Amino acid sequence: EVDRKAGEWVETGVKYSIGSDADVAIVTSVDLDHQDWLGDTRSEIGKAKLGVARRNKPLLVGEPDLPHGFANKVADIGADALFIGKDLRVLEDKNKSSFTSYVKDNGLTRSIGPMDHCSLLPENITLALQALVSAGFSLNSDICCRTISSLSLIGRLQKVKFKGINVILDVAHNPAAARILRENLPVVSGKTFAVASVLADKDWAGIVEQMGTSVDDWLIGQINDNQRALDARSLLKVVYTAQHKGRCYQSVENAFQQAIIEASSLDQVIVFGSFHTVSAVLTVMSKEG
């Protein structure tokens, strides 16, 4: 949400409640995660996330596959909704190296771009640009393009080179996020090593299924700084059940170090599954880099 009185961007989190009304509300996606707070179905989760919406205030929706009852709930709230794929669009260039965002400005469609790809998803960038326009900010297209093309966010499709090896770090910890990670993986001529681990409330089997054959070798590390972490051996059994190759290690750090030892310059190492997983690897890289 955007709170203009406070001059701040406010992320509501999974409990979706703040003390002030929203000038602009954003629902980026609706999928299964945090079910203990939000509900057991996409329909329940969608309605829960709409707790950020306000009557006669802009609501920006980035979920292309709306769950049952979502549109009716938006109508009941009376928010001024704009939807990705309908009101807001992303147009990729032919070689997918850049994209253009189409937003609504005073009822008219406005293009911003082309912008070079960065570690943030074009759809989310489009939502952010629309949020600024909806909040009353005047955007300079050239400045937006230069700024966005240089953006990066730690742990979100973050690409780094470590000891000559291409490493991608992403905090994807549910099947929907794993699918997005898979769809945005670079094509390499070598192998893809996965360094992964998750907490106990995550759909690990669904994550493994989404990553599928895009991973050649799974290196499962034990998360040791959170009691909710699943046992690495249990995670490995799921990998084996899915007919994939893998092994487990006493720590995420050990799993990552082994992946770097085995990988060549033609390979890539992807790190995902939890904020704890990515954090452990970032610590290793900062100490050994």
Task: Describe each region flagged by the PLM.
Residues E1-E11, S17, A22-I112, I125-D142:
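Acidic, Mg2+-coordinating active-site environments of NTP-dependent enzymes
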Residues V2-I26, V30, E44, L108-D217:
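Nucleotide phosphate-binding/pyrophosphate-handling subdomain across enzymes
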Residues G19, V30-W37, C145-I148, L219-V239, ...:
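Flexible, gly/pro- and Lys/Arg-enriched active-site loops
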Residues L50-L59, V188-T192, S214-D217, S265:
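Short, surface-exposed connector motifs at secondary-structure boundaries
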Residues L60, P64-G69, K73-L82, N166-L169, ...:
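C-terminal helical cap/extension that packs against the catalytic core
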Residues G62-E63, K73-K94, P114-S119, D142-L151, ...:
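Beta-strand->loop->alpha-helix junctions that form or flank phosphate-binding loops
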Residues S274:
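Active-site-proximal loop/hinge segments that shape catalytic or ion-binding/gating pockets
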